[in-house]
């Protein structure tokens, strides 16, 4: 199951495009949208917590990632068609989504992960968190619609008006969304975060499956969840919420700097250290000026702290495994330029020595060679 999900996320997750039946000037993949929604949800959570409300950020991240799995199976139903179906018959679409999830969960995989997916998706008790998720999705759709409507206004007019009306209804129920929509600086900050969808990895190579830094962060976060779960089963006491926050935030500077590849970073002594200073200065100049000082202090440890404690080590392992799977999917699509990189990364992954990472290498990577067609 895990290998199949990892494969689907890099396959359909990158090839599924938002607004795919609309003319558009911006390509947004399923994973790009998911990544931005997570970042918006976490920013709204921060704003809510400034008003002394406690938000379950772990639930936000897991619910959004787990709920996206259905879309990977039901890839042919776009968002607006889905909304119309829901408006006419919620029950029948719920049955369809349940069947899609069953197709995933019936595959062989760790039972505790399957149970966590089911429990998280069935937990409707967290009303504030669910409202934040709803708001984040609408806001992400709104930002996508703004871009494309500037050129194709006659096509997007009705959709844009519907999204704006929905946002207005939601902002009356959610103070953090009202604060976001009322604060131009916050919107500028999130615009820079959204730029991660346009910062691409492996830019020195031709790719069959181009992957943005935003999509990569979602993928790393899911891998971190898997590694944590398996390690936790074997006596680890690492804090998963902190791990997932490190995973989703750690590449934010690349919205400004772009993705500088590791060989370049390590080509001469001292260059890595200079880049770290540059990242901090560019974040100050381009992004942090739009947010309060306490938000900067909150988020900075997830971005700038070195990979030297156990949580950072797991996040770094997940980052490397993401590169491994990204290279693997290229090889499987006859892109031989990635074979040497794949073998080098695999050798590195073999040296990590954790139960979870050994399991990833020995079993899950083989799922990329299997042709599992998941249809309901």
Where in the sequence are the language-model features?
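Alpha-helical, largely C-terminal catalytic domains
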Residues: 1-376
């Amino acid at each position: 199951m895990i290998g199949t999900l990892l494969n689907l996320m890099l396959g359909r997750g990158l090839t599924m495009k938002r607004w795919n039946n609309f003319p558009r000037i911006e390509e947004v993949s399923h994973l790009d949208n998911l990544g931005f929604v997570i970042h918006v949800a976490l920013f709204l959570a921060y704003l809510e917590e400034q008003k002394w409300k406690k938000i379950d950020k772990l639930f936000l991240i897991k619910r959004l990632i787990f709920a996206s799995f259905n879309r990977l199976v039901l890839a042919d139903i776009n968002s607006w068609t889905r909304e119309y179906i829901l408006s006419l018959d919620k029950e029948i679409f719920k049955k369809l989504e349940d069947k899609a999830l069953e197709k995933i969960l019936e595959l062989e995989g760790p039972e505790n992960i399957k149970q966590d997916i089911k429990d998280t998706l069935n937990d409707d008790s967290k009303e504030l968190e669910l409202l934040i998720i709803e708001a984040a999705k609408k806001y992400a759709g709104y930002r996508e619609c703004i871009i494309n409507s500037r050129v194709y206004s006659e096509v997007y007019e009705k959709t844009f008006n519907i999204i704006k009306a929905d946002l207005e209804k939601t902002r009356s129920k959610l103070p953090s969304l009202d604060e976001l929509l009322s604060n131009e600086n916050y919107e500028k900050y999130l615009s820079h975060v959204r730029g991660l969808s346009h910062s691409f990895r492996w830019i020195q190579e031709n790719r069959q499956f181009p992957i943005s830094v935003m999509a990569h962060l979602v993928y790393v976060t899911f891998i971190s969840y898997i590694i944590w779960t398996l390690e936790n089963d074997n006596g680890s006491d690492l804090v998963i919420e902190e791990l997932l926050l490190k995973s989703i935030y750690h590449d934010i500077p690349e919205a400004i700097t772009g993705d500088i590849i590791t060989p370049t970073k390590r080509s001469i002594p001292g260059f890595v250290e200079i880049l770290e200073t540059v990242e901090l200065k560019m974040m100050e100049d381009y992004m942090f000026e739009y947010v309060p000082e306490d938000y900067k202090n909150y988020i900075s440890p997830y971005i700038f702290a070195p990979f030297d404690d156990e949580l950072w080590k797991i996040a770094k392992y997940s980052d490397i495994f993401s590169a491994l799977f990204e290279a693997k999917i290229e090889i499987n699509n006859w892109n031989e330029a990635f074979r040497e990189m794949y073998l080098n990364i695999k050798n590195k992954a073999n040296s990590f020595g954790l139960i979870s990472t050994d399991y990833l290498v020995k079993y899950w990577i083989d799922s990329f060679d299997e042709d599992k067609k998941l249809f309901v």
